[in-house]
């Protein structure tokens, strides 16, 4: 059993004339996930916050990130995710992006960093695809 605790900051991207070219990350606002890998298979997500999250894991952006990681690496395991701090969805400061990034980074840490930064972005994009209802193409 291996456990990690990861933080992904909230972000603001539409800064004045920079539109989506300039952005910033916030120091203390963000998502904190505790992730544990054990033998077996499956995903459990427990919400320890007051922020409402989907009850069905198929509707949570964390799930496709974990699945993409396993697909890309050929690894397996049961992943237990505890959401300890959460950006409120729809707040405009990157709630789905923070969850997706934290899940991708956490998975990479749990499994001793088999993915490059670019590969972690590919995993995180799976969560963003779910959140946006479409697929982001041509980013990498």
Which ranges hold each PLM region?
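ATP-binding N-lobe of GHMP and related small-molecule kinases
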Residues: 1-91, 109, 113-115
């Amino acid at each position: 059993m291996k456990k990690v605790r990861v933080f992904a900051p909230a972000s603001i991207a539409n800064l004045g004339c920079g539109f989506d070219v300039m952005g910033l990350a916030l120091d203390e606002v963000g998502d904190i996930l505790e992730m544990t890998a054990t033998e077996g298979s499956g995903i459990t997500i427990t919400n320890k916050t007051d922020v409402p999250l989907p009850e069905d894991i198929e509707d949570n952006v964390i799930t496709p990130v974990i699945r993409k990681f396993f697909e890309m690496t050929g690894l397996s395991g049961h992943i237990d995710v505890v959401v300890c701090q959460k950006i409120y969805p729809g707040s405009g400061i990157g709630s789905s992006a923070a969850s997706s990034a934290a899940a991708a980074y956490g998975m990479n840490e749990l499994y001793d960093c088999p993915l490059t930064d670019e590969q972690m972005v590919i995993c995180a994009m799976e969560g963003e695809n779910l959140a946006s209802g479409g697929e982001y193409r041509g980013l990498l």
